[in-house]
């Protein structure tokens, strides 16, 4: 959004773009750019310069120079008016806000340090104005930050954080208020002393790392900084005035050029249109490509969606005949095999174990009345909602009993899920968190489930994509589940076996 799709910084890494890179291209890149006249050797420590130069000549002396290639990317087109860009994340209970735009700030610009002080005061540390407003004063978020980055081609300003759905619009309003304050008011004496002292302290602590010292030397060489730039850093920092900070705010805080990017539940999108210059919400997919949201009106009610699903997986008689199910699945995580076993039995009995290379990571069990959970052998506290969820999981087809258990059901609309149109069904239980299921319009099968995992600052949205339905004793069962949102990368779980109506002794569900 900030740089545009034609600028290298605006490129998004996808499976397709990665596949476009061949081994020959990597070899050519290495040949073109890994040359001594395009390299720096930096040594930090208690060393003898003469000895280290001799050692460098010994090991790198035969390295042949090459033609140093230079590329200048196209200029970034500054957004001329504020726009509201929205990326739908189904089922999300929080919105991620990023107010962002490119800035012309080079590493060797004379006002770089002044600009950094301004940004730190605005949103660069815990006691910043932005955090004080949205976290401390209003309680909208657990933390909000801003950053102002320099770059030899084009820098970037960004401000935002995660906020509750219902205060997304209010959070954006408060962000604009704080920007206006920075541009129209001198900071207070207390703020002035605090921000400079914090930055001076951070700088001093950073010198404890040899990597930081090496990076300072590299910056001086690469960006033609004064040789005493870092020696005089604290002195120059303390010389930044209140007026300097006000001037920098007016130079670099440009909300009129901003993309307000919001990732969250589309149910809140219409409330945000007022922030866009054209009073429209511009929708994008996760790769930053413009899309049109589906506006079709659902033709089925919630009960009809579930009836169609039950019929699709085998019919109500087949579904009700199920008394037990045992499923074994496997997934791979960084070359290690994760085994997942799930057993269900009528009477609210449920067992799930997750093992990594033979060692049990997690175990959940419900005997129909009581329930327990452990992670790596350590007992976990279960809420009433957790226990009820485990009981619900014991059903082969829990959808059949949603209404009888008092769940509130609502078809919210039609979504495009991985190229398929699907009904969005929101389920609100009597106890616990709401979740969402997506049913393929064509087949009637569930193709996605979205649930909220965790609480407070640790809350995350877990998405499970279901596919590869196969028949087992006359019933369709998904044999592939891709789980995303609760870990750095998606986890693909494949069903290895499904046993329906085979004896599972009650002792399997015994709670220790």
Show the residue positions of the predicted features.
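Flexible, processing/modification-adjacent segments and terminal tails
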Residues: 297-311, 365-433, 441-443, 452-461, ...
């Amino acid at each position: 959004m900030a740089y545009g799709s034609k600028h290298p910084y605006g490129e998004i890494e996808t499976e397709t773009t990665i596949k476009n890179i061949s081994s020959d291209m990597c070899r050519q890149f290495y040949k073109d750019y890994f040359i001594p006249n395009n390299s720096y050797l930096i040594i930090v420590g208690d060393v003898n310069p003469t000895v280290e130069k001799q050692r460098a000549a010994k090991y790198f002396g035969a390295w042949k120079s090459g033609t140093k290639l230079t590329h200048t990317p196209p200029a970034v087109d500054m957004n001329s008016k504020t726009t509201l860009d929205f990326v739908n994340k189904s089922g999300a209970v929080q919105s991620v806000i990023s107010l962002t735009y490119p800035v012309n700030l080079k590493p060797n610009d004379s006002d770089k340090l002044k600009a950094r002080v301004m940004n730190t005061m605005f949103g660069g540390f815990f006691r910043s104005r932005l955090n004080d407003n949205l976290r401390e004063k209003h309680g909208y978020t657990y933390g909000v930050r801003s950053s102002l980055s320099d770059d030899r081609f084009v820098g970037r300003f960004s401000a935002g954080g995660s906020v509750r759905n219902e205060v997304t619009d209010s959070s954006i309003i408060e962000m604009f208020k704080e920007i206006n304050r920075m541009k129209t008011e001198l900071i207070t004496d207390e703020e002035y002393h605090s921000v400079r002292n914090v930055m001076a302290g951070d700088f001093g602590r950073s010198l404890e790392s040899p990597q930081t010292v090496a990076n300072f030397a590299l910056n001086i060489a690469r960006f033609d900084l004064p040789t005493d730039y870092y020696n005089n850093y604290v002195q120059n920092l303390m010389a930044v005035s209140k007026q300097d900070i006000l001037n920098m705010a007016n130079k670099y805080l440009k909300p009129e050029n901003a993309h307000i990017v919001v990732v969250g539940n589309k149910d809140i999108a219409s409330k945000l249109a007022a922030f866009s210059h054209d009073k429209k919400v511009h929708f994008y997919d996760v790769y930053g490509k413009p899309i049109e949201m589906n506006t079709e009106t659902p033709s089925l009610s919630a009960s009809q969606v579930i009836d169609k699903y039950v019929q699709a997986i085998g019919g109500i008689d087949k579904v009700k005949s199920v008394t037990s199910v045992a499923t074994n699945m496997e997934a791979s995580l960084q070359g290690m095999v994760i085994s997942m076993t799930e057993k269900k039995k009528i009477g609210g009995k449920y067992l799930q174990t997750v093992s990594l290379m033979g060692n049990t990571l997690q175990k959940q069990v419900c005997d129909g009345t009581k329930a327990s959970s452990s992670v790596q052998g350590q007992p976990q506290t279960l809420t009433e909602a957790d226990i009820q969820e485990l009981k619900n999981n014991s059903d082969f087809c829990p959808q059949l009993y949603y209404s009888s258990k008092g769940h509130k059901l609502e078809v919210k609309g039609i979504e495009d899920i991985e190229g398929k149109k699907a009904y969005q069904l929101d389920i609100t239980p009597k106890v616990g968190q709401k979740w969402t299921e997506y049913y393929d319009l064509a087949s009637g099968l569930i193709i996605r489930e979205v649930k909220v995992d965790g609480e407070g600052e640790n809350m995350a949205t877990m998405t499970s994509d279901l596919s590869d339905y196969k028949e087992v004793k006359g019933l369709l069962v998904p044999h592939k589940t891709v789980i995303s949102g609760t870990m750095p990368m998606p986890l693909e779980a494949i069903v290895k076996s499904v046993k329906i109506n085979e004896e599972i002794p009650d002792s399997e569900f015994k709670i220790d």
